[in-house]
Amino acid sequence: MTDVVRDFDALYAKLEAPPHNLRLVLECCAPESGPLDLAAIQERKSYTCCALNNRRNCVLHKCVVVVFGTALDARLRAPSAEFDAQNNLRGTFMLDGRFLSFPNIMMNNNVLMHNFYDKLYAKHCKRMFLYGNVDAEKHINRAIQLVYDKATRRLFARDVYASDYVVTDDLNAVLETYLASSGKWRPLDHLFRYSKAHKQQLVDHIKMIMHHDICYSIDNLANKIIYKHAYLMELLLTSTVLQHYQKRAGENEALKRRLECEGEPPASKRRKAQSVLYGKESKKIVDSVVNGRLIYCVSKTFSKQRRSFPNQHDNCSNNNIEISLPVLKYRVGSEVTRITNDSVRQKMLKQKKDFVKFIGSFFHGEMTVAGKKFFLCRNARLPNVDYAMVADKFAELQQFGLVAPVHDLAHCADGALLIAFNDRPTNLQCARADVPKIVYRLKRDRCPIELKASSNILYVNHHEGMVCIAKRVRIGAPVNASINALLTPYEYHYKNSLFHAPTVSACEIEESDDVRCLMSKLEQYYFAEYTHLFYTIPVPKMIVALTNLKNAMPVLRYSTLGTAPVGLSVAVGDHVLMNNKMVKLWTLVRDSKLMTAEDPYIPHMALPIRLYNHKVNKLKGKLALAGKAVPTLKFVASSGPHNCVVLPDNMVQYFAGTVLSGAKIVWAHDGKRCMVEACTNGAHNVYKVYVFFRRTRNQAVESLAASMTLAGDAVIVRTAVVTSTDDLEGVKVCSVHGQKGVLNRSEDLTEWMAEDGTHAQICLSPVSYLSRQSNFERLERKYVVRGGNHADPRARRYPIFNIPYMLFNNTPDNIYKEFNKKNYTGHEKVEGTRFDQWTKNQSFVGNRLAESLQWMRGGSNLPQNCGEFEVVSSLLMCNNVVMK
């Protein structure tokens, strides 16, 4: 779990502090303007701000994304506490009028050494990139690639010009250059200043480091890094604008000082001040954010792939996630997307053993991207990269005499461990006996530094994208202390880890976990009192419940209901409200006239639930302007109770209003959702706008509203229709047990009455209850008697259970969008359907196998089996048919 708001608060503070000293304002042309309300921000469509320097030049022009809930948001937006609390906006941002979140992104770890296979080399090699050779002009940090073949003990190198060669001692000088100025961890450059003898031994030192066995494959979490949104945003701003701006500001300052020293007056000729310094670069930043391609800051591979395959629309092209309000609590910041290349195979996407307790074990995202979207467990942490902090830690080790300098590898003591930082050779060593003390100094206070050890090397790692888990560690003699530590997947899961080798580190992880350690904070919040279900009922049912939780209609409190959110929502009574996605209903396991066959539920005829549908339509038109004359334009919205009428086909026609225009308007619409009647009145064009919506049983029209906006020559008429109904028949429900079904015809369930007056509110199928292996342990229960006569001792008592449910609704529009507007290729998987080719084939084979074989066997009317039967029966890998 990571806090997006805290991360972005830190980013904004960094922009406003030295050396940048920028001032964040909503508009660079009006920096003193007051805060805007949310409606005005939605009209602007994008919630971004500008960054001004002390000369009031705009350095970052409308490209700094403002995240809702941050201190900057509180400064730029008028307070709307009720709306924020109801919709849980915290951590989201707005672009193109849509609320979006950016997931944490998982990639392969190219910072450290990793297993590597290439046709040019042996099958089991190790690879490492050495960064350096920084080109300050082009802001490029080049890298040479080192590949080590353990079998032959040979080191190969590929330089920045893509030339391959076997490494000899001649490379020592080049290695020193790359290691001494990596450009990535400048506060630690002093670790890579070697003695004269050591400089001649760097190749051997690197071979020693790369000879160490890595016991994880490329798909393991130990070989992954997870980038946070704020870090990628900072990289984008720095690489695109800030790096160049700082360099130019430094040059100007140096020139000013030189002129002052020489006594020369500054040039009298003044150039015209430029208000926006980096217009094109700012536009590039906005495009990167809008297209969800922040990951390109750290990986150029994806941009190359897109250029190579322009027609291929992969799932990685846009990582922004559009979020419908209200947002699931604790979703933002916990969600992780795994980036994969074009040749995605199912085995690449499965989770390895070291994902446990770091990545949620129950929520695996949508079927379309199975294995690529998941959630961080509650105890997982994504720490910030801080090389200055690591430099302070090394200074602390030197202060306590726990490390010593290396002058010559040949003169190192037998009990000494050479220290490597991020798998690079350093000029330090330590004693093996001091490892427990070093662990204490480097790991305490949840310091995000990874420690590994081999027979002669202590690996100290700290880099971007680390993923850790918060644990308590007990360190024995000579330290004898317990510390709060952050452990990486390697440290926590692998038997070769220091924390599973007490003879070396004297460490022991203190464990007190239950099933909640496998769950994200989102799951723990929504299933707070029902976590026991995760280990008492089948896991697939819990996955169903979690998937449906994400897709469920928002649940609102009826007593304080203001404007219903856009789309479908549910308003409920206070006594059945559980959270913003669930309602609690008293459930009785029974059937009536087979009404619960095929999974339907029987609801009570008067449930305290009302469905709301807030439908927004935008009718767009273009003014046919002649010259630069501004046309007269006016919109008169209709009012009163008689502005809608029911048509014979059960549709409702709503008269939205009249547009009066001095110029002709060309409207873009299909005539299905809305209708425009046009006529002329003298020099004016008159357009009457009508909107259609579907009529349902017991429907009440809550509100009808219309408005018009003008942007350039574009006219937009926006209509909002809010309807509600208490008819729940056909609404899909899902319980916390993963029991899906639809609501059937309602019955009067007040005859099933408890002593305190509580009655059953919904009936669950007895067959479904048994077949799904559900249980009602630890659920609130009461006992009811049919008819409510509890004085009768012979009357049978039946238990009812207070079970949370999620509700869904499919309108004809949603069904049309989901099914009819898609081109099926046979490769996609639409959740909850059987439309894909794989499922069709499985179903056909399963249902037809037995009769097909029987038909083949008897088809020839001969006593012996025909050849076709023999062939087909031999091809069956798995079959549940008994052949006699």
Curated annotation (Swiss-Prot):
InterPro entries referenced in this protein's UniProt entry, alphabetically: DNA-dir_RNAP_su2_hyb_sf, LEF-8, RNA_pol_bsu_CS
Superkingdom of source: Viruses
Reactions accelerated catalytically: RNA(n) + a ribonucleoside 5'-triphosphate = RNA(n+1) + diphosphate
Entry coiled-coil feature ranges: none
PROSITE patterns assigned to the protein according to its UniProt record, in alphabetical order: RNA_POL_BETA
Enzyme class of the recorded protein, top EC level: transferase
Molecular-function GO term, any one: DNA-directed RNA polymerase activity
GO biological process: DNA-templated transcription
Keyword Transcription: yes
Keywords assigned by UniProt, alphabetized: DNA-directed RNA polymerase, Nucleotidyltransferase, Transcription, Transferase
EC number: 2.7.7.6
Entry GO CC: DNA-directed RNA polymerase complex
Pfam families in UniProt: LEF-8
Function: Required for late and very late gene expression. May be a component of the novel RNA polymerase activity induced by baculovirus infection.
Family in the record: Belongs to the RNA polymerase beta chain family.
Name recorded for this polypeptide: Probable DNA-directed RNA polymerase subunit beta
Lineage, highest ranks first: Viruses, Viruses incertae sedis, Naldaviricetes, Lefavirales, Baculoviridae
